[in-house]
Amino acid sequence: MFSHHHDVIIVGTGPAGLGAAFHLAEHSPSLSILMIDREKICSGGLLNDCKQNYTYPIGFDVENWTREEAERILPMVEKWLQPAIKEKKNLEVYRRRAERLDVTLLDIRQAHVGTDRSRALIQRLQDELTRRGVSFLPEQEVTDVFDSADGTGIVIAGTETVQAGKVIVAPGRKGFSFLQQVMERMSIAYIDNVVDVGIRVETTQGNYPIVNDYYDPKFIFPDGVRTFCTNSGHARVVLERYQGFSLINGHALSEEQTGNNLVNFALLKTIGLKDPVRSGQQMAVFLARLANEIGGGMPLMQRVGDFRMGKRSTAETFNEDLYSFPPSCPVTAGDLGLAVPAKIMRHIWAALKKLDTIVPGILHPSTIMYYPEIKMYANKPAFLDRYFRVSSNIYMIGDGAGTSRGITGAWASGIRAAEGILHGQ
């Protein structure tokens, strides 16, 4: 049994929640802290691949973070995650090519754990928190959060109430709908007008050799397009299942595993919506369901060779002799042009052509484009202070709340929320 009152309840055991828990447990050991999650084990980026970026602005929402603030907190993130920073080489060669095309190549301090080793990292982190007195309640779904004159706390499974002095809500990207419901019920103003829509590219390492020099190269193109989440070594494209549709994602195993000679990365376009369409989440769900409908209940994939010739890919010809590798995620072969909005596809294709000039080979006919890859983390509450407080005793943080875009930014957001709680003690 667990106590029905805690000093702090943290909803979500991902990096944002963990960051808050570690900071609170370290600086105020007497606090009673409960972490609750609907999953059995911490989900999100820590479980899937666990790629970490330690250079601002990657992973940080620039509206809520200055360089000085990020650089103050990032060493605290490193203290607990203990990253093995990857080396880079030949960066200037690629950077000079990029600059001639008005493309920016960022120099980022990175670490990569790998999907096969991520559970061990999560277990180490949870064991350390348990040793420090933090309680965990897995496989319990929080259905509401409240903060009123009658008290502060959470509701589990629609019936059971647990009281708290403070509540930190960190449900991650998949919790965006829950977060919106809570904000609407509590009359918390929020903005939801940004969404990232794009494709995931899969090819051989020979066609994208930059990954031998720079594990996750961060290219920023004109028109709001960027590369995101590059995986190599033993890399696979995977499905992310949501209620009513599936999205594309990618991951890789650790360097200890035998490679499969494949590379995958996302090309995402950031879209800021204006009147009359204002909900990035609604647009994302619409585009995802449209693609799944065209794909017969699955996402789509198309070879670059077919795309350049203006014809759809078919299941019968997808693995013919011209193509040097089969898809690691065999979804529906088809025509991306039927599903991707024309303006988005035009900007992504322009970015791909520039990337092929910087790293010749990426537009080999066998290269596969998967769609849709969509990042739904656009909720941005109206924060009351720099600690991400949304009401007297409620804090909202992480990718789902728009304070971060990745593991390190989410962890740093948790630290800032924890600082707010400690500041108010």
Segments (PLM) and residue ranges:
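Cleavable N-terminal targeting peptides that direct proteins into the secretory/outer-membrane pathway or into
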Residues: 82-83, 98
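Residues forming the flavin
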Residues: 1-65, 88-96, 101-425
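Conserved catalytic/binding loops enriched for acidic/polar residues
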Residues: 69-77
